[in-house]
Amino acid sequence: MDSWFILILFGSGLIHISANNTTTVSPSLGTTRLIKTSTTESAKEENKTSNSTSSVISLSVTPTFSPNLTLEPTYVTTVNSSHSDNGTKRAASTESGGTTISPNGTYGTWLTDNQFTDARTEPWEGNSSSAATTPETFPPADETPIIAVMVALSSLLVILFIIIVLYMLRFKKYKQAGSHSNSFRLSNGRTEDVEPQSVPLLARSPSTNRKYPPLPVDKLEEEINRRMADDNKLFREEFNALPACPIQATCEAASKEENKEKNRYVNLLPYDHSRVHLTPVEGVPDSDYINASFINGYQEKNKFIAAQGPKEETVNDFWRMIWEQNTATIVMVTNLKERKECKCAQYWPDQGCWPYGNVRVSVEDVTVLVDYTVRKFCIQQVGDVTNRKPQRLITQFHFTSWPDFGVPFTPIGMLKFLKKVKACNPQYAGAIVVHCSAGVGRTGTFVVIDAMLDMMHSERKVDVYGFVSRIRAQRCQMVQTDMQYVFIYQALLEHYLYGDTELEVTSLDTHLQKIYNKIPGTSNNGLEEEFKKLTSIKIQNDKMRTGYLPANMKKNRVLQIIPYEFNRVIIPVKRGEENTDYVNASFIDPYRQKDSYIASQGPLLHTTEDFWRMIWEWKSCSIVMLTELEERGQEKCAQYWPSDGLVSYGDITVELKKEEECESYTVRDLLVTNTRENKSRQIRQFHFHGWPEVGIPSDGKGMINIIAAVQKQQQQSGNHPITVHCSAGAGRTGTFCALSTVLECVKAEGILDVFQTVKTLRLQRPHMVQILEQYEFCYKVVQEYIDAFSDYANFK
């Protein structure tokens, strides 16, 4: 029921009660009460002896006011009866009865049972042979004091009612401001919607007491494991204990009618005390408003501006804010569209220059990487023909790996992304603008990770609960889900356990000298300790369901190497045949583009058709083979191509068109035809012969050459997945994928991170880079590449 309807009913009730209180007795009439009397048969004569009972009772009610009580009268009831032995009057004072509210609504003192018995329930004591009911009229009394008291009481009730109404008005305004509404309506991406959308908010925490103190970093892993038990039960409790928002905060500016269309979600609004104020535009009412809030960093006030993703109608305001706040860095943690819904308007041109209100934006450079894209913009105020006003360089870091649902699979990409943002933002610049769609969930997650990493370095402890509580006082619902909350802890643990392992190419020599030294107190050197950390990563066998199905077990060459569900390569099901969508292969994300590699086992004789169906379905034009068909007398891979002529594998026919021997590998050009579709494609196979049956290659030259040849082929054939296989699809396959990724990063940015590259691969497929020698080989090849960089300048 509507709260206003309830208030009206409540008010009506108060008025009704007040009316009853002030009209209980007419001032001009006495009070009449029916008293039942009884006499003996001989009592007709009034002057008989005391054996006759004359029960004429005189009962008067007179209000008596105590000087100490201003509002409540004390009633003294006097009962006159000739039945008394001495004929005197008996007075019933307040001491013999309890002060209550009488049935007619007036205050009074009720007599006890031995003082007064209602004639409606029991007759008077005595002979009941002749009972009569006689009306008795009390004399009129002056009721003016009663009326005055009741008027005063009514006034107090009315004042109380007004106070409640005013409180409810304030509560409703606060609720409209988005403090703790639980309703939601997801964005549908239509810019013409009349009403802004809303998103789900969490209920207010019933308690703000501090149950979650800061954690020392050496207790971090233990605590995270404890809280993640029982499906993150303790983490959910901690998250639900967070305060939603400060009760005193208001959102008056955001709630104005003129500003409603500027909000993407109706219940995610900036507080008045922390919102970003734009310079008002002359003649445009409320032009100082934008849905953005200042947010503190770890020890830096207003380090960030948390903003909603711009709408089409607020793009100009967004760039006005960037200019006025002297922002140099924009962090975008959403894609323009997710689940076919518009999450953010594209507020930059794809190329060239475009004016947005009074700010002109031109694109200077774009770098696309696997987890994020970096765009550099040059901005200048419009109308500056003389170029007197300086141009400014703005860098946008667009994190593209956040999934539509949940959080990233691993925090590694986010940590690398955050490091880039920290390194790029200049000292002189204003606040870093961070936005997702609503500007609270992913935005809050980014801000908290940044602050807690700073706290970790400064104090050797983290205070996630406390920091989230504080920034929620600046913008509601920062860190919006328990999954985001857990992801923050995972990112902090990742950084604590493994640190920053990224290197500048110029420091590789120093690093290699360091990792070959023995670690004091152990028999291992640094390299062995690094690899030991990699092998300690748990293999998640419970996430390999399809590969372990009985129908698919025989399709696996090595039972310890099964693809994970989340990234396994799926092929079309054969008509009328179940479990024919499985092949032992995994999509792998390298440096620049998602799913750039397919890491596959070497086909078995009975899975060769599935292998070619995979090649056709995913349009792979490059195959890298890192094993011989047979090694040490054991079959390592079925021959899946013809030595000459053509061979059919189901609907796929393969014809050898050309074979060329290079220094350490063979190139075969194959014409692959799908007879069902009547289409053909050219596919090139690179068969590497430089890997010995035991150990690793003696040098990295052959591997560098084949990687360069494959990259060149990719440029010509298009960016479709490169299929890489050895025998089991893990050891040599992982080494090739790791080296391709690291060398590409070296060439593009002059940095490398062998440890995290291999760690990421192992999270995508078990046992990638399988042995210590293969891990060491990665470092050696990178070192060779850097030493002879000029010789491989054409590596693209």
From Swiss-Prot:
GO terms for cellular component: focal adhesion; membrane; receptor complex; Schaffer collateral - CA1 synapse; synaptic membrane. The chain crosses the membrane at residues 146-169. The gene is Ptpra. Part of a complex comprised of PTPRA, BCAR1, BCAR3 (via SH2 domain), and SRC. Within the complex, interacts (when phosphorylated on Tyr-792) with BCAR3 (via SH2 domain). Interacts with GRB2. GO terms for molecular function: protein tyrosine phosphatase activity; protein-containing complex binding. Keywords: Cell junction, Cell membrane, Glycoprotein, Hydrolase, Membrane, Phosphoprotein, Protein phosphatase, Repeat, Signal, Transmembrane, Transmembrane helix. Residues 20-145 are extracellular. This is Receptor-type tyrosine-protein phosphatase alpha. GO terms for biological process: insulin receptor signaling pathway; integrin-mediated signaling pathway; modulation of chemical synaptic transmission; oligodendrocyte differentiation; positive regulation of oligodendrocyte differentiation; regulation of focal adhesion assembly; signal transduction. Glycans are attached at residues 20-21, 47, 51, 68, 80, 86, 104, 127. Tyrosine protein phosphatase which is involved in integrin-mediated focal adhesion formation. Following integrin engagement, specifically recruits BCAR3, BCAR1 and CRK to focal adhesions thereby promoting SRC-mediated phosphorylation of BRAC1 and the subsequent activation of PAK and small GTPase RAC1 and CDC42. Residues 170-796 are cytoplasmic. It is a single-pass type I membrane protein. Residues 1-19 form the signal peptide. It is an enzyme of class 3 (hydrolase). The active site is at residues 436, 726. The keyword rRNA processing does not apply. Integrin binding to extracellular matrix induces phosphorylation at Tyr-792 which induces PTPRA localization and recruitment of BCAR3, BCAR1 and CRK to focal adhesions. Substrate binds at residues 404, 436-442, 480.
